[in-house]
């Protein structure tokens, strides 16, 4: 067993056919969301670093008239006795047995000494005074102070009183016991293993359609919606559940036997014949891996069909071993070949129909789109900030052989969830977050090249720059390491029970404390949730019930955007007053009606407004009485989606007007490399750049090889 070192991901949600967990990132953010890459850094803070000491008040009754008992006792005598007490090895040993390590001991001792030596000794507990007097006279040993010290330490650090209970509550080593419904079923597990474009999901979905009742769990809202539409088109009634939306094949009084959902929204109480869990390798994801682990262990189905990379096979078997479930693996080969080109593109004049330039920031999207336009090529554009409707519209334009947009510029948002007829995937860079792309991510992106049954059946992967091609070949040639451990998160009930023992702790403090004491087995890690904690800090001073605060803090909100964060705080504050969050109140903050985008900044503003409306719909799913105008907000959201589509259609004119508007190229919800699109704060962080050249690397479109060449040239000039 080991102590968890991440920041927990805990989510709450819906009842009935919806999951009891929320879905903060299922529908809009791709798995490789680099905005959150910073979250993958494991937290190392211990409970001793987190807890704050409480001031212990002196007794209200005084020790007046005790002169005959304490004699000439004064603060000097007391200091001598306490110093001797502190140095005793036995005292330290007893403290450790009661959960007081050296750090807590010194903090507790400092408070204890201050308590024992006030200006007026009459305010000290009489029993303690008598003992201190006896110790100073030599008739009692200083170690007899320990019971008083321990009692004081527990008042200074209340968690010490409940430490054993807190460890029991935060024990996450046996998550399979959390799902009694699933444990009551004799489940058959099928693993459909293969690369992109191998037909693994197709075969699993065939079984989904054949079953009398079934649930599909996808990684993205777009994919869940696609399964929803296709299933209904086949004449099989199917409902849809995502974090922001519920749709019924008939109506809410007649739920269908088939359900398509984002993976976070799976209800572990829903009994079905077949459950399909797509992209099972997402178990490894730092942010969302907990949802796949929960689905794997908690889906109450006779048959579980897993689809994903072979790298997940071993860990899936290990996770199911304690409950006696075995896995039948079915391997699939890629239906069309994927080749690595011998040459890089190098020039935009070499771009051809069916090409997709993959970037890792909005800045690079804008840069490459403008270069293509200068070469007479009108591209389709897809990046993470775009609403689903706009993404689908851009994908449709690119896929349409009669449309002039036969080239695509996209972030790695294309890695999953969109059907695209791509011939060549062109990597604009091989780095993301200033680090080389991991093999599994590069293969996921490269695998989008070539699509069985289309004009581009044979796929090709290459790079924009000649110097990156060797790097790409090396990355893609590496074997994907088997997944060693998977994400896990505690339940809301665990957090709530934890809070009962620490009633004075803020929600932020509860999160930190839970992580510092919880335990997980070697097959698991606690999913990080930097954004959840940031949201908790934003509304820390707003009075909200724990469940409400908890749900607000699991919202799928971009915490790096000050405007959306400010609206989030206003929503929480109005909620706390008991006032309904109405449509009129909401649009009043958004300067409604919106104006068509004529610059990149204005397009970015429309995207922010869309995210705010999306946030409203997400909260409305959980608090329909307090956010009653979901239908009107959804209509407004559709209107914004259309306006954003129009803005993207006139993308090139926006670029010409706003090419210098660097703010519009801010953080995107898709994976954005810091090298391609660093924020101002990142550029200014101390100790993060060792030279001006490395600063240029972060600000401009310069590769690592370019940087090395610059160094060599400067060295020659010096000589």
Curated annotation (Swiss-Prot):
Gene3D superfamilies: 1.10.1740.140, 1.20.272.40, 1.20.58.1080, P-loop containing nucleotide triphosphate hydrolases. GO terms for molecular function: ATP binding; ATP hydrolysis activity; DNA binding; DNA helicase activity; RNA helicase activity. Belongs to the helicase family. It catalyses: ATP + H2O = ADP + phosphate + H(+). The keyword Transcription does not apply. This is ATP-dependent RNA helicase SUV3 homolog, mitochondrial. PANTHER family: ATP-DEPENDENT RNA AND DNA HELICASE (PTHR12131), ATP-DEPENDENT RNA HELICASE SUPV3L1, MITOCHONDRIAL-RELATED (PTHR12131:SF1).
């Amino acid at each position: 067993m080991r102590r968890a070192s991440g920041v927990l991901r805990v989510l709450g949600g819906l009842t009935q056919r919806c999951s009891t967990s929320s879905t903060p990132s299922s529908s809009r953010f791709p798995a490789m969301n680099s905005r959150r890459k910073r979250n993958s850094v494991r937290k190392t803070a211990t409970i001793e670093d987190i807890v704050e000491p409480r001031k212990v008040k002196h007794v209200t009754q005084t020790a007046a008239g005790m002169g005959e008992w304490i004699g000439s006792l004064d603060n000097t005598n007391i200091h001598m006795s306490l110093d001797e007490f502190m140095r005793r090895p036995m005292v330290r040993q007893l403290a450790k047995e009661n959960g007081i390590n050296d750090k807590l001991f010194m903090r507790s001792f400092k408070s204890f000494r201050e308590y024992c030596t006030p200006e007026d000794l009459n305010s000290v507990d009489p029993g303690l005074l008598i003992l201190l007097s006896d110790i100073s006279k030599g008739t009692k040993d200083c170690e007899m102070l320990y019971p008083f010290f321990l009692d004081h330490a527990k008042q200074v650090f209340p968690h010490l009183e409940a430490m054993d209970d807190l460890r029991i509550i935060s024990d996450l080593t046996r998550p399979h016991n959390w799902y009694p419904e699933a444990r009551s079923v004799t489940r058959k597990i099928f693993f459909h293993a293969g690369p992109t474009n191998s037909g693994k999901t197709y075969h699993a979905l065939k079984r989904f359609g054949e079953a009398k009742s079934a649930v599909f769990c996808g990684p993205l809202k777009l994919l869940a919606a696609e399964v929803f539409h296709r299933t209904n088109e086949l004449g099989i009634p199917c409902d849809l559940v995502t974090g922001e939306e519920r749709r019924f094949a008939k109506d809410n009084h007649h739920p269908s036997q088939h359900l398509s959902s984002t993976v976070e929204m799976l209800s572990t109480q829903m009994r079905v014949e077949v459950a399909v869990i797509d992209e099972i390798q997402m178990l490894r994801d730092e942010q969302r891996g907990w949802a796949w682990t929960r689905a794997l262990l908690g889906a109450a189905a006779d048959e579980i069909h897993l689809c994903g990379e072979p790298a997940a096979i071993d860990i899936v078997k290990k996770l199911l071993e304690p409950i006696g479930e075995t896995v039948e693996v079915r391997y699939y080969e890629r239906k069309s070949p994927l080749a690595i080109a011998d040459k890089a593109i190098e020039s935009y004049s070499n771009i051809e129909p069916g090409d997709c330039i993959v970037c890792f920031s909005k800045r690079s999207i804008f840069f490459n789109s403008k270069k293509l336009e200068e070469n007479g090529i009108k591209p389709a554009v897809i990046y993470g900030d775009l609403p689903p409707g706009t993404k689908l519209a851009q994908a449709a334009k690119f896929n349409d052989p009669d449309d002039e947009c036969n080239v695509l510029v996209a972030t790695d948002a294309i890695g999953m969830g969109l059907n695209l007829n791509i011939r060549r995937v062109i990597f604009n860079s091989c780095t993301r977050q200033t680090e080389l792309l991991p093999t599994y991510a590069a293969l996921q992106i490269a695998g989008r090249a070539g699509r069985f049954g289309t004009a581009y059946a044979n796929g090709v992967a290459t790079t924009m720059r000649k110097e990156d091609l060797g790097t790409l070949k090396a990355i893609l040639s590496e074997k994907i390491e088997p997944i060693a451990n998977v994400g896990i998160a505690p339940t809301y009930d665990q957090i709530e029970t934890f809070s009962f023992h620490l009633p004075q702790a803020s929600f932020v403090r509860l999160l930190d404390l839970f992580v510092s004491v919880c335990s997980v087995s070697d097959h698991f890690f606690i999913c990080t949730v930097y954004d959840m904690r940031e949201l908790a800090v934003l509304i820390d001073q707003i009075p909200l019930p724990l469940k409400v605060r908890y749900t607000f803090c699991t919202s799928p909100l971009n915490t790096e955007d000050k405007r959306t964060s400010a609206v989030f705080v206003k929503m929480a504050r109005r909620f706390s007053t008991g006032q309904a969050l109405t449509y009129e109140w909401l649009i009043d903050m958004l300067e409604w009606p919106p104006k068509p985008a004529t610059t990149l900044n204005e397009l970015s503003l429309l995207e922010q407004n869309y995210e705010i409306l999306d946030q409203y719909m997400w909260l409305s799913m959980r608090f329909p009485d307090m956010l009653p105008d979901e239908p009107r907000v959804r209509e407004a959201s559709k209107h914004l989606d259309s306006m954003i589509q129009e803005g993207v259609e006139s993308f090139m004119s926006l670029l010409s007007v706003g090419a210098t508007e660097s703010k519009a190229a801010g953080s995107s919800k898709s994976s954005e490399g810091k090298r391609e699109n660093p924020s101002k704060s990142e550029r200014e962080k101390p100790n993060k750049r060792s030279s001006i050249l490395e600063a240029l690397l972060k600000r401009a479109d310069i590769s690592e090889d370019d940087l090395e060449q610059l160094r060599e040239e400067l060295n020659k000039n010096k000589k």
